[in-house]
Amino acid sequence: TLMIISKELKKVPGVKEALVGMGTDLNLDIAKVTGLSSPELEAITPNDFFVALDCENEEVEAAALKALEEQLNKKEESRSAAYYPPTLTSALKADPKINLALISVPGRHAYDVAKDALDKNINVMLFSDNVSMEEEKKLKEYAVSKELLMMGPDCGTAVVNGLPLAFANVIHKGPIGICGASGTGTQELTILIDQLGSGITQALGTGGRDLKAEIGGLMFKQCLNALIADPDTKVIIMLSKPPADHVAKEILAIAKECNDHIKPVVVDFIGGDPNLPKEYGLTAAYNLEDAARKAVALSKGEPVPADMLDIDMPKAELEALIERETSKMAPTQKYYRGFFSGGTLADESMKLSIGKLGHIYSNIPLKPEDKIENPLTAEIGRAHV
């Protein structure tokens, strides 16, 4: 992948920083934070490919470009060892039983490619982003009309029949199903369930915008109903950031019917009000680990554990950890920076930290007034990135 190529270029002696990718807003933000931005780079579109380098001199730059060429050729050589169908049509000719397509193409092509798959009665996991809200709604309405899954756009994690897709991990099969509108949250949740000795049937992603008012939870409801109908799924976890009000009522009503008559449902609206699911008689979770513990207990027919509201560690062990870590710091250090590989993990950590520390500044803050553009260089206090 392009991330791996960026990592390899950084290993070239004399390369201070390297970034290879498409011109998405996220990648351009990374370029700004890492000091690689330029007027030329800021002018590109999400469909443009770019290479940004910070090298000590021209000789290092030449070596880095040579390494880039080698990495790109290496990728092509590895592909030549196996057959990779160039189109969906040719893939279906090679294997007519295909019923799921994982799509990762530039955003301007994503709608057409996903629509083509749905036309052919193939479920879709759309990894691509930069798809308009209007196109997303059209795709999902079409998928629902054909009783197909349209996971995404910007769906980064799913596990289907034990097969991890995109950023998912290999985990054990088990009795728990996940309906998730958060990729990193779903990924972390599956790992926690696995570590607790259980496993999952399916982890179905929807894309982060599905529960917004404009989309109306079209795919969340589709995935939820699929898990309700699945006889191997004994417990369901609903995971998302707080949905739009009317969408929350609709999906919670479906969950209540399931919880009352079919199978238990655990709800984790990250950063939301845990009392809302309780009003529907559902099991509310306060964080990802709390959701995992409660789902595993319910799957075993055990009592639901007490709410996990704080760090679950013996006091003496926690104090020893604090002493060990603070001993590594200089006396002048007083603010910390939290670095997270996913927005959900940052949100959850901020929610837990704000209650004890007050303001947490971030590039994705829980409160608008705590917004900072460049948390790597800001000197205004505690920050999560």
Stretches with model-predicted labels:
Residues 1-382:
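Catalytic-core regions of core metabolic enzymes
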